[in-house]
Amino acid sequence: MIIRAGKEIDLARILQIEKRAFPNSAWSKEMIHNELLERSDRKTWVIESKKELIGYCMIQFGPEEVHLINMAVEPSFQKMGLGRKLLHYFLDTNAPNTSIFLEVKRGNFPAINLYLNAGFEEITIRQKYYTEGEDAIIMCLKV
């Protein structure tokens, strides 16, 4: 497994994973392009297996906190610990001495468990946060 910074050439594959992982609420190509290439306060990490991009996480860096804004693993590679590996890489290398926030769908139990096991705590519920009306759990990891 290799984890590296995302590049423009990764855009199509990230979009493909996004649509497979979140079929009812996938980000658009424009949104992913903006996060990957246009914003200086953003960073995208990708994970590869045998030179195939199989997951990514997108981070927003603020002056006092970091926000994990999107993360997905190709569905056929889920339940192999790759999301955990990617999350811990991000935590170990990019988020020293700062609080990290994220939103996760209330019904996304695998992701919720991943974040709880990494030390995140549930802060509050944001009602009907997602486009399809599902609530978001706001989580925080205080470093």
Whereabouts are the PLM-identified features?
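Short glycine/proline-centered loop/turn elements that form peptide/ligand docking sites
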Residues: G83, L87, N108-A111, K128-G133
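Conserved acetyl-CoA-binding loop-helix of GNAT-fold acetyltransferases
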Residues: K79-D92, I112-N117
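Conserved GNAT acetyl-CoA-binding A-motif
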Residues: T93-K105
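Conserved catalytic-core motifs of GNAT/GCN5-like acyltransferases
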Residues: F101-E103, L116, E121-I137
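Extreme N-terminal starter segment of soluble prokaryotic enzymes
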Residues: M1-I3
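Conserved hydrophobic/aromatic "anchor" residues
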Residues: F22, Y56, F77, L114, ...
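Residue-level recognition of the GNAT/N-acetyltransferase active site
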Residues: E74, Q78, K105-G107
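Acetyl-CoA-dependent GNAT
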Residues: A5-S76, L87-T93, K142
